[in-house]
């Protein structure tokens, strides 16, 4: 399974101060998500953000009669999400720290690197939130899986204070919105995430919407420098 080189979009305002690494969903590509950079960079607060859009390797998809598609992990069934391709997931997860360290080498601190993804890409995003050993800037999870119980052995508390924006549609035909609510409960109650916002969109399917993008932008702007401690009051 050969991989396509990630698409990299430079910050409009240099030097770059922030970085976003965005993972696509099944059958998509990094190119399919470059619109997000264009949208976010329009805002002056994110003009100094640079973006990385990786593309998953092509692999046979079991649930699709082994037809090949770009995927971060195999899909074994469209009807059940309990059987997870851990081997494929863990292999794809190896890419995440490499991309993060590339940004650090370019002068972007961990605390200003955001990870995001859609569907399978959301699984990588939340897997990173649970396992990465350094505090990151934040996480964007769009239409992700209904459970991360299979990741419990990898849990780190380094990012429990990082901001998480999780979105889901009530008409999602792949992952029901009830699963999103369960994920939110587990991240806040079981794993101790303190700034985890779940936004459910009425009538939205396994997709994103203009309102969702506006909400994500507002959340990002409100949390861009969340790693900075509040200033002490003057004595």
From Swiss-Prot:
It is an enzyme of class 3 (hydrolase). GO terms for biological process: fatty acid metabolic process. Gene3D superfamilies: alpha/beta hydrolase (3.40.50.1820). Keywords: Cytoplasm, Fatty acid metabolism, Hydrolase, Lipid metabolism, Nucleus, Serine esterase. It comes from the Eukaryota. It is found in: Cytoplasm; Nucleus. The active site is at 119 (charge relay system), 172 (charge relay system), 206 (charge relay system). Its EC number is 3.1.2.-, 3.1.2.22. GO terms for molecular function: carboxylic ester hydrolase activity; palmitoyl-(protein) hydrolase activity. It catalyses: S-hexadecanoyl-L-cysteinyl-[protein] + H2O = L-cysteinyl-[protein] + hexadecanoate + H(+). The keyword Lipid metabolism applies. InterPro entries: AB_hydrolase_fold, LYPA1-2/EST-like, PLipase/COase/thioEstase. GO terms for cellular component: cytoplasm; nucleus. Hydrolyzes fatty acids from S-acylated cysteine residues in proteins with a strong preference for palmitoylated G-alpha proteins over other acyl substrates. Mediates the deacylation of G-alpha proteins such as GPA1 in vivo, but has weak or no activity toward palmitoylated Ras proteins. Has weak lysophospholipase activity in vitro; however such activity may not exist in vivo. Belongs to the AB hydrolase superfamily. AB hydrolase 2 family. This is Acyl-protein thioesterase 1. It comes from Eremothecium gossypii (strain ATCC 10895 / CBS 109.51 / FGSC 9923 / NRRL Y-1056).
């Amino acid at each position: 399974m050969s991989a396509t080189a990630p698409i990299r979009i430079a910050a409009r305002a240099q030097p770059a101060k922030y970085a976003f690494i965005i993972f696509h969903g099944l059958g998509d590509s990094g190119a399919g998500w470059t619109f997000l950079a264009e949208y976010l960079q329009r805002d002056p607060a994110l003009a100094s953000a640079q973006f990385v859009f990786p593309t998953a390797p092509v692999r046979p998809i079991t649930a699709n009669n082994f037809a090949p598609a770009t995927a971060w992990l195999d899909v074994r069934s469209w009807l059940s999400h309990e059987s997870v391709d851990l081997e494929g997931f863990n292999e794809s997860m190896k890419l995440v720290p490499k991309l993060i360290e590339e940004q650090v080498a370019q002068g972007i601190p961990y605390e200003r690197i955001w990870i995001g993804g859609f569907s399978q890409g959301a699984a990588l995003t939340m897997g990173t939130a649970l396992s990465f050993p350094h505090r990151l800037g934040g996480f964007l999870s769009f239409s992700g899986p209904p459970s991360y119980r299979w990741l419990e052995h990898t849990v780190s508390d380094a990012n429990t204070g990082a901001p998480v924006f999780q979105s889901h549609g009530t008409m999602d035909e792949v992952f029901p919105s009830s699963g999103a609510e369960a994920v939110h409960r587990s991240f806040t109650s079981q794993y101790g995430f303190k700034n985890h916002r779940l936004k459910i969109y009425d009538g939205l399917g396994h997709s994103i919407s203009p309102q969702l993008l506006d909400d994500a932008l507002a959340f990002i702007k409100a949390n861009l420098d969340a790693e900075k401690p509040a200033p002490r009051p003057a004595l």
